């Protein structure tokens, strides 16, 4: 049974007034969720910004997309997450990743370790955070963290627990995500620490097929219960689908045909975009679509047609 479609809007780059107004408008338009990335750029800090969005709305879910594990100790992070779930009356989704943006690490003076080390550290964080958010005792003596105890109140209030999202684009990360997460973010690989042509070339249909195989390797029998998410880096309602793709594809280091086949680009009329998203679910199981705030209004008819189906 496929997962129902839902859609999220990124609040990245918005000031405080625009952030809450955009969250309220997203809720009115039928979007499931608002998100914030986790970077030292011109944007609200993710957990504070999402708390504001949650308190300004009534049904909208909130998702940090995604928190870089290296920036926070897992027990303190679990405390923040539990509080946000309680304040939002159970509307939190937790997105975690291994961290990637070189400039963040350099600015903060945090060691930008190898991808393998960062993923091992993330795996330990997950093994600490998941039971803490369930109200369970943790006894963990690992390579990176030593934790003993239970999380004090407030605990999460969400029925069934707080959904965990892990996102990435390479084998170790997606295998871990398949084994541990409820929601899997299928991303272009960003091991270079920057978004460049290599990321575009890792966003094609062929690469997505490989990534789904890695998720399946980690998930085993639980794969069919997972929710798969994609982030749209190009989203445009247009009657000139091929022309837009031909113009944008060279910036990504791929062909127009590859751009139109990627689950990270969506260009076309409303009807074409609806058909394309349905095709992604049929082909890959992707049902959770994330886009930027500037595309929110244009894609509202797509959201209205597909949400919950």
Task: Identify the role of each PLM range.
Residues 1-309:
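Active-site-adjacent structural elements that line small-molecule/cofactor binding pockets in enzymes
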């Amino acid at each position: 049974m496929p997962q129902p479609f839902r859609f999220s809007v990124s609040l990245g780059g918005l000031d405080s007034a625009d952030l809450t107004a955009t969250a309220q408008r997203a809720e009115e338009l039928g979007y499931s969720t608002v998100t914030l990335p986790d970077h030292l750029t011109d944007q609200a800090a993710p957990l504070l910004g999402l708390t504001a969005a949650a308190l300004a709305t009534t049904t909208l879910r909130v998702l940090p997309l995604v928190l870089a594990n290296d920036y926070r100790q897992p027990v303190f992070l679990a405390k923040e997450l539990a509080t946000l779930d309680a304040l939002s009356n159970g509307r939190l989704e937790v997105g975690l990743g291994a961290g990637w943006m070189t400039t963040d690490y350099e600015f903060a003076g945090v060691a930008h370790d190898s991808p393998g080390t960062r993923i091992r550290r993330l795996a330990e964080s997950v093994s600490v955070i998941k039971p803490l958010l369930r109200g369970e005792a943790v006894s963990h003596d690992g390579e990176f963290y030593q934790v003993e105890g239970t999380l004090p109140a407030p605990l999460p209030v969400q029925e069934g627990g707080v959904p965990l999202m892990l996102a990435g684009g390479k084998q170790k990360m997606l295998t871990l995500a398949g084994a541990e997460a409820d929601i899997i973010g299928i991303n272009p690989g960003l091991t270079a620490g920057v978004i460049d042509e290599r990321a575009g070339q890792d966003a094609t249909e062929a690469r997505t097929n490989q990534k789904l195989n890695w998720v399946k390797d980690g998930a085993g029998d639980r794969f069919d219960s997972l929710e798969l998410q994609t982030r749209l880096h190009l989203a445009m309602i247009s009657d000139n689908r091929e022309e837009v793709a031909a113009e944008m594809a060279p910036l990504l280091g791929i062909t127009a045909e590859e751009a139109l086949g990627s689950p990270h680009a969506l260009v076309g009329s409303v009807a074409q975009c609806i058909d394309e998203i349905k095709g992604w679910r049929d082909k890959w199981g992707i049902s959770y679509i994330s886009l930027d705030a500037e595309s929110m209004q244009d894609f509202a008819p797509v959201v209205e047609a597909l949400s919950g189906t």
